[in-house]
A protein has these predicted regions:
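Conserved catalytic core of the tyrosine transesterase superfamily
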Residues: 1-308
Length: 308
C-alpha cells in the first residue's frame, strides 16, 4: 500500500522546531539555524518544481540540491552546516515514524572532501550526445542544449534564459546574463555553434513561440521557455539510457567544462571569467580534481609508484 504523502511544509517545520526546543533543549538561535536549513531546501524544491513529499525525496535529490548550492558559490563550510541541519531533520522524521528512509544518510560532509558533484569524462558526454534520437522533434534541441552546457559552461538558468539576440554568430561568442544580472561574454566553439544553429534554423522553426518567448532559444512544445526541472529530466534520461550511474544534473556539464579546461592547462583567471565566478577562489576548487588526475597518472605510469 502506498504511503500517505507527507510534505515538507511550514507546519511540519514548526513541529520540528518544537521538538528541537522542547526535546533537545536547543537555544532559540540553534533552532532558528536548523529550521533555516530545512526552509532553504524547501525553497529549492519549490524553485525546481520537485515534490516536497518526504517519501519521494531521494539521495539524488539531496545531491542535486548541494550541486545547486555549489553553483551559487556557497562554500564547503556553509554546505556542511546545511547538510548537518538536513540530517537532523531526517532523524526527527524517522523518530516520529513519518518516513522509513533517510536520503541524507550516505551523503558525506563537504568538509570531508565533498566539494563537487560527479564530473563526466569527455567520452561519457560524447556518448550521451551521440545517443540523442534526432528523428524525434526534441532531438536537435536536446543535442544543442548539451553542446552549449558543456561547450560554454553555462548555469542551467543561463541556458534556459539564452536569447537568439545574445548569440554573436560571426564572432563566436554568447552574451550571458548571469547572477545579479551581470553580463559576460563566453566563447562558443565552431562545432557547438553549428549544432546550435542546426536547431535554431531547423526544428525550432516548427514551433510557434508565445509572444514573450519569440527570442528565447530553447523552447518546449508549447512555445515557452524550458524549466530547470525539464532540463534535469532530459539529462537524467540520457544518463540512464547510456548506463551512466554517476549522480548528475545539468550543473554537471558546467563542472565538467571547468575541470576539463583546467586539466588541459587553461589559465585559472580565464576559466573564472567564463564561468562568471565573482571570486577566483570558487574556481580554484576545480583544481582539486586536476590534482587527483595528476596523482592517478603518477601512480599508473611512474616506475616508483607501480605495484610490484
Amino acid at each position: 500500500m502506498d504511503k500517505t504523502p507527507v510534505n515538507i511544509s511550514p507546519n511540519l517545520i514548526k513541529h520540528y522546531a518544537d521538538y528541537l526546543r522542547l526535546e533537545l533543549s536547543l537555544s532559540d538561535n540553534s533552532v532558528e539555524a536548523y529550521c533555516h536549513d530545512v526552509n532553504l531546501f524547501l525553497q529549492y524544491l519549490e524553485v525546481e518544481k520537485i515534490s516536497a513529499d518526504i517519501n519521494t525525496i531521494t539521495q539524488e535529490t539531496i545531491d542535486n540540491f548541494f550541486a545547486y548550492l555549489f553553483d551559487l558559490s556557497i562554500g564547503a563550510t556553509s554546505q556542511a552546516r546545511i547538510l548537518s541541519g538536513l540530517k537532523s531533520f531526517w532523524r526527527y522524521l524517522t523518530q516520529e515514524n513519518l518516513t522509513e528512509t533517510d536520503p541524507t544518510l550516505l551523503i558525506p560532509s563537504p568538509s570531508m572532501g565533498r566539494h563537487l558533484p560527479e564530473v563526466l569524462s569527455y567520452e561519457e558526454i560524447q556518448k550521451m550526445i551521440d545517443s540523442i534520437d534526432l528523428s524525434q522533434p526534441t532531438g536537435h534541441r536536446n543535442k544543442a542544449m548539451i553542446e552549449v552546457m558543456y561547450g560554454c559552461g553555462l548555469r542551467v538558468s543561463e541556458l534556459i534564459g539564452l536569447q537568439i539576440s545574445d548569440i554573436y554568430r560571426n564572432d563566436g561568442f554568447l552574451r550571458i546574463i548571469g547572477k545579479g544580472s551581470k553580463e559576460r561574454l563566453v566563447p562558443i566553439g565552431d562545432s557547438s555553434l553549428k549544432i546550435l544553429f542546426q536547431y535554431i534554423e531547423g526544428a525550432r522553426l516548427h514551433i510557434t513561440p508565445k509572444p514573450k518567448f519569440t527570442d528565447t532559444v530553447f523552447l518546449n512544445s508549447r512555445g515557452t521557455s524550458l524549466t530547470r526541472q525539464m532540463v534535469f529530466l532530459i539529462v537524467k534520461d540520457l544518463a540512464e539510457k547510456n548506463g551512466i550511474t554517476k549522480v548528475i544534473s545539468p550543473h554537471t556539464f558546467r563542472h565538467s567544462f571547468a575541470t576539463h579546461l583546467l586539466e588541459g592547462g587553461a589559465n585559472l583567471l580565464a576559466v573564472q571569467q567564463m564561468l562568471g565566478h565573482a571570486s577566483v577562489s570558487t574556481t580554484e576548487i576545480y583544481t582539486h580534481i586536476s590534482d587527483e588526475l595528476l596523482r592517478d597518472t603518477l601512480t599508473s605510469y611512474h616506475p616508483r609508484f607501480r605495484k610490484i
